[in-house]
């Protein structure tokens, strides 16, 4: 946000220095990024007077100028289109550095003629992009003086950084209001001359979606002259980098920068029929007769329409975009940009002047999707003060009446109402002291809040506080405390010695455990990622039921307006982005928070894999990731935590998170506590993110994972048998509902002196087996530590195993 000192003084009686103002702005939370003083930067450029000119003997487009300076008459060669005798100009003497290009002026010979300086344009001094000619100064400018005082540049420019929640200071008036509350100057009262309307507008207004457009106002103005705006207005806008175009455009820019309320002007002679505001973007003229237009709404397969904007670009709008239409088509993208069809030009004599409030989320979503950045969008998506909208329309109307000639003005046409008064919050002295350490009397608190525009009502130790209409970010007691502190002064808060910290062993152990989890996954080829804890509510509703309390009040963007219910959407989004860049093989994880409600935040370790385990090469065809890869990674993490994954798997649960495949995922529990899930991601999720390959993931709730006390002691020595190992294959027929993992775990523990490993190599179910049965085939490695196993030993083992499987699982050996 840029503004000049003189612009600030239009609304604030102030005698403070530029430095004092800059410090005060930073103190109240409006960080000053820069103070630009053009007068100092351009102090070496002086006023000069062209006494006489004559043609250059060797160049038709160049002139030889006799220029009067404080050091006498100089000859300067100039090719500007507006160079002529008897005008005051800006001179750069020899040795001065020109801002554009950073080159120094030297005595030079141009086409055989000497030149002892340079006559400057705005572009060369980086004042604007206008290179049509040299700067012309007023006749009263004194030769030899610094030119800036005659060109309105002796006006320091403040550049402040505005946070997304402070839409109220996107106008100079709002900044003046804050400085006045700080005690730096007195806010001037806005005096508005009475506007005498001379007719009623016949243009009808229909607002189809009051939630999308809570207030829309306009006036019709006739017989105006859209001439260049006065010099004071042009200079204000130029100083903050706004190109001046015409009175109408300059006035709307002035209102937006002064009060934060975007204003739009339509050429009334290009508007046909009624105006309507809504999200039905498709319309087409089907007949035209005596200026009466009939329209038909076209519903194409994707409900889209083309919109030609004032910036010369064409945009494809959808039914989600809020538009302003007449009966001939779209005339504007609400809150963002006007259409080319009804734009004003020098010949415009009749206009419709609009001031409105639009839904901030809709404006932000459309602007982001269409990649349109305008000052109007910037302000609308940060919320407009609906109670000031009609007053802004009046101020703009008065400016048009004073600048654009003897105009006729209609009554205001309005749909919608001002914002209702907000619900009061009960604020106490004790609450302020509790969270800030500041002790103020209830009277002092009331004075500060009143200066900021808050309505207060003291009831004993409680102040009932109602936030002003322009402060959309004041919703809780902490917001009020922040307002008090920033005006009272952060520098007045006494510093205190912090208490000595006592290390919490549990926190330290938890930190070390999480670090170990990360190392385990990293050793398996997983990469760690860190993503934002906020996400789009559109994405979030695919993973959990949306809760109103998890919506952010002031999101940075519409894509980050919801507190994530799970980390998975962020990781799946990364997969989608990588696939778009032809990266197909991925394995990564994140440790981060998920939010159940405002009071419950859980820390999850979430991992995800997709693509191939290893790349194809001459020695391997590669292998795609499957559910066992993600299970293996989870198993190692769980085992490090002192648990067994097999004991945590719940096989018969059918209720899974909606984003998992219904038959290829499983819950993991420790008793009644849900620890997480693992499995394949649901195809509908993949389709939403435009992913054409399988994804497997696990989610481990670290918050619910017990912190088992670490056991230290002497490790058992690894013993390797010197005797031959034997391998036996078995196929057992068991019931379909028996878990294969449970059977394998049982065999592993069946005879620990002999069984070294058990590997599953086949599962079969089909016509060759009885109904409700399946066959599992396993390979068992048998090895004794003290002898070579004989055939008798092996047969005895087989007989015992078959009998045990029969008793435990009602299984039979397949012939």
From Swiss-Prot:
Residues 39-148 form the tRNA-binding domain. InterPro entries: aa-tRNA-synth_II/BPL/LPL, B3/B4_tRNA-bd, DNA-bd_dom_put_sf, Fdx_antiC-bd, Fdx_antiC-bd_sf, NA-bd_OB-fold, Phe-tRNA-ligase_IIc_bsu, Phe-tRNA-ligase_IIc_bsu_bact. Its EC number is 6.1.1.20. GO terms for molecular function: ATP binding; magnesium ion binding; phenylalanine-tRNA ligase activity; tRNA binding. The keyword Metal-binding applies. Keywords: Aminoacyl-tRNA synthetase, ATP-binding, Cytoplasm, Ligase, Magnesium, Metal-binding, Nucleotide-binding, Protein biosynthesis, RNA-binding, tRNA-binding. It comes from the Bacteria. One of its GO terms (cellular component) is phenylalanine-tRNA ligase complex. Its main location: cytoplasm. It holds the Pfam family tRNA_bind. GO terms for biological process: phenylalanyl-tRNA aminoacylation. Coiled coil: none annotated. Residues 420-495 form the B5 domain. It catalyses: tRNA(Phe) + L-phenylalanine + ATP = L-phenylalanyl-tRNA(Phe) + AMP + diphosphate + H(+). Binds 2 magnesium ions per tetramer. Residues 721-814 form the FDX-ACB domain. It is found in: Cytoplasm. Its cofactor is Mg(2+). Gene3D superfamilies: 3.30.56.10, Bira Bifunctional Protein, Domain 2, Ferrodoxin-fold anticodon-binding domain, Nucleic acid-binding proteins, Phenylalanyl-trna Synthetase, Chain B, domain 3. Mg(2+) binds at residues 473, 479, 482-483. NCBIfam families: pheT_bact, YtpR. Tetramer of two alpha and two beta subunits. HAMAP family: Phe_tRNA_synth_beta1. Belongs to the phenylalanyl-tRNA synthetase beta subunit family. Type 1 subfamily. This is Phenylalanine--tRNA ligase beta subunit. It comes from Rickettsia typhi (strain ATCC VR-144 / Wilmington).
